């Protein structure tokens, strides 16, 4: 009996601590890769939250949930109820509301927060970017210029271009817009990246595109349209990213894993 008690005491002293509970705010390729890496690491349990921006999101490793939390207050309640140790914000660079809610909820609950955000694209020689601060400014630019426009900003902001009467739009999005498209002249193209240079160049030429509207999402999956625009000397209305909330941030999955290793080194 005493030997068993001693063995149990030793096991209790050396057993692994409880896994770190991670709430991963997903929606990007980096978030999917990070979920897979964390799910394979016994030090962590991960649940990915998908806001529902796309109807058929790609599968993620580990647990997942869909839909919002009900703003900052709802997310704060969830963090407390689920005993979340850290929130990792792996959302799109333009998901400003989600990121702001996460920052405020983490502040309220004293929950650790890390942002994983790929670097933006940088303008290079040959690029003809028309930098704008937001979607309304992009729409105003298109309204002034007119022409045949390749609109690649996702389905949620299309309505901002409804006043562009002198433009024809090739609208590309993963899913059909939930509401009626209010622009007068358009063609809808449903497609999910990654896209390659040859196909993007052919798409622009075939449709006689003379202006592209894009968010500065960064990353390789949709960069081919920027390369194609450069090759064809086409102007790109480039929408700058919103300013993110203050806090710890890293540019890649590997950097996130290194940050987590350092942050929780003493725990394990």
Protein language model annotation of sequence segments:
Residues 86-133:
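Glycine/small-residue-rich loop that forms an oxyanion/phosphate-binding "nest" at active or ligand-binding sites
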Residues 63-79, 190-199:
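Glycine-rich, highly charged phosphate/nucleotide-binding loops
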Residues 182, 186-206, 211, 216-232, ...:
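A C-terminal functional module that forms or caps the active site or interfaces directly
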Residues 152-188:
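Anionic-ligand binding region
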Residues 24-40, 47-51:
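N-terminal basic/disordered segments at the start of proteins
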Residues 216-218, 225-228, 236, 240-268:
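C-terminal functional extensions of proteins
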Residues 49-56, 116-121, 155-157, 173-179:
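Short, polar loop motifs at secondary-structure junctions
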Residues 48-69, 181-186:
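N-terminal beta-loop-helix "entrance" segment that forms/cooperates
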């Amino acid at each position: 009996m005493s030997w068993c008690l001693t063995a149990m005491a030793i096991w209790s002293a050396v057993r692994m601590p409880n896994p770190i509970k991670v709430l991963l705010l997903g929606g990007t390729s980096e978030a999917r890769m990070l979920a897979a890496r964390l799910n394979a690491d016994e030090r962590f349990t991960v649940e990915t939250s998908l806001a529902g921006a796309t109807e058929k999101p790609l599968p993620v490793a580990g647990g997942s949930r869909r839909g919002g939390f009900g703003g900052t207050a709802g997310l704060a309640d969830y963090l407390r109820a689920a005993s979340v140790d850290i929130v990792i914000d792996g959302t799109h660079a333009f998901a400003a509301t989600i990121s702001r809610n996460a920052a405020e909820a983490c502040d309220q609950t004293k929950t650790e927060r890390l942002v994983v955000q790929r670097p933006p694209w940088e303008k290079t020689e040959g690029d003809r970017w028309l930098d704008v601060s937001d979607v309304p400014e992009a729409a105003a630019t298109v309204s002034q210029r007119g022409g045949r426009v390749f609109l690649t900003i996702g389905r949620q902001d299309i309505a901002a271009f409804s006043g562009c009467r002198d433009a024809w739009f090739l609208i590309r999005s993963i899913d059909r817009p939930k509401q009626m498209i209010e622009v007068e002249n358009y063609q809808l193209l449903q497609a999910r990246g990654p896209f390659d240079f040859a196909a993007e160049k052919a798409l622009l030429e075939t449709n006689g595109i003379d202006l592209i509207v894009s968010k500065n999402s960064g990353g390789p999956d949709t960069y081919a349209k920027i390369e194609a625009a450069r090759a064809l000397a086409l102007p790109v209305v480039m929408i700058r990213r919103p300013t993110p909330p203050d806090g710890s941030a890293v540019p890649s999955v590997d950097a996130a894993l290194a940050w987590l290793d350092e942050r929780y080194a003493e725990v394990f």
